Design a protein with these regions (language model features):
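Extended, charge-rich, solvent-exposed interface segments
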Residues: 84-104
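Single-stranded nucleic-acid-binding OB-fold domains
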Residues: 1-91
């Protein structure tokens, strides 16, 4: 069961994430094998910093409904990649206005 995470700056590889973030960048990128579809590459931020994120499943659907500047609720897990880390997102949706404080 996901728990409310700390700020982005406090995340560590292996953490389960249930949080709200701002989308700074969103790009739909085809897999090397085009028959496999695409994944959604995101740059997410909060007041403490930013982190890369990926939506591997149903990426086209997510990309169609999300834009830079949207505040989203995400659920996923922090994973290592090369010299950094990213969030592998399992669920993502736009946050409702009553769910977030824009000061965060």
């Amino acid at each position: 069961m996901p728990t409310k995470t700390r700020l982005i700056a406090d995340l560590h590889v292996g953490d389960v994430v249930l949080s709200y973030c701002l989308i700074k960048r969103a790009r739909l990128i085809p897999f090397k094998d085009p028959a496999s579809g695409s994944f959604l590459s995101l740059l997410l931020s909060d007041r403490s910093g930013q982190i890369s994120a990926r939506v591997w499943e149903r990426a086209e659907q997510s990309a169609a409904s999300l834009n830079p500047g949207d505040v989203v609720k995400i659920q996923g897990k922090v994973r290592a990649y090369q010299d950094g880390m990213y969030i592998a997102i399992r669920q993502i949706r736009r946050a409702r206005p009553d769910e977030v404080d824009l000061a965060d």
